[in-house]
């Protein structure tokens, strides 16, 4: 949950403002832009005493005067090396510091952080919100829950970008919350209910298909995964339609894997760290975070949000290794490993969305393979796709938002590895080689000629991450910022 209630942009003078904490930025070798004269040279004295030069990562804290109780100066580093992602990380440290001081509000001199620039302003707001994120919903003895009621950003800053950054970061925080909730609290039914609620609030059309409808609809691949939970935790296919663009414009489709708990099914996983399999719905969490963001910011583009939500459980009715199922597009699949279930869910959702909505492009998000961790570790999302132009759009947004990703090849030769002796294709490759690529090769069978990029977020969806605005533990809300940037670029 987010512990900042609101971020306000004010034109108040720093000298006249009453605040618990005033935050200033100083570039390496730079000055405080004459602000210190209004604070009786308090800051200059502290800076001199600490031999502070504005070096990146360094900071100085001192007491202020009657109106300004405390003043903190954060080093920005060299001007030419300051990036929007660096600003985002710095802002997250500022809100974390204010939280640790249990302040109800604090103020930031926008000019000293370069917040008249739109990208810096948006990144700063994102960092403030994400740096204050914590998840304490299930602590019976919660630590003193503290909320920063207000952050005031002062001066000539890009107010619209501040507002947009706050909304986007709240979308990321929502995706984090969904991932952090346990599987007994975020079921397919609850996820569907939340999607309906967001859609209704924004005037969007939502359609929820129950598992009882899957076979009649031809969703045989998805149904196979859901069999082990039928009658207990029923699967849902969630579709939300946002029409912000022209009526004649084809929609952009976002598809999420929503396996709310993955035991592996009959091909059951080892017990070690199986609790982490609540995170196997983080692809759908990204789609839900984007749904929330789009509902609030209302970009001028048509978007389809689609989620396949189910558990993957062993049961007397569960799918068996060796079963053959028929997907929505008519392809037959030999299921040789029930723990390679995410691709079976996505196969039907991708082909259904492609058939019913004829999207201009599709992106899918899934914690799909452990192999992507072997290839890229936890530092980057794996990207694979069938269209160079769309892939370049994704890469540009990856660079712009600091959400690192890396393209892996998807050559036709890899399709040979998923050919089956008894069906059209099988749901695993040949042995341990190129697991991420063969999984994407499987998905490619269900997108037709539609431009498509697959995000394998198994390495980036949860766990401790390096940037300061990422959580120390738990769900990261990966892909929300990147994809909203891409949608916005499409509009522009």
Where are these regions (language model features)?
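Short amphipathic alpha-helical segment within the helicase RecA-like ATPase core
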Residues: 1-258
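A generic structural signal for tightly packed, nonpolar segments enriched in small/aliphatic residues
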Residues: 192-492
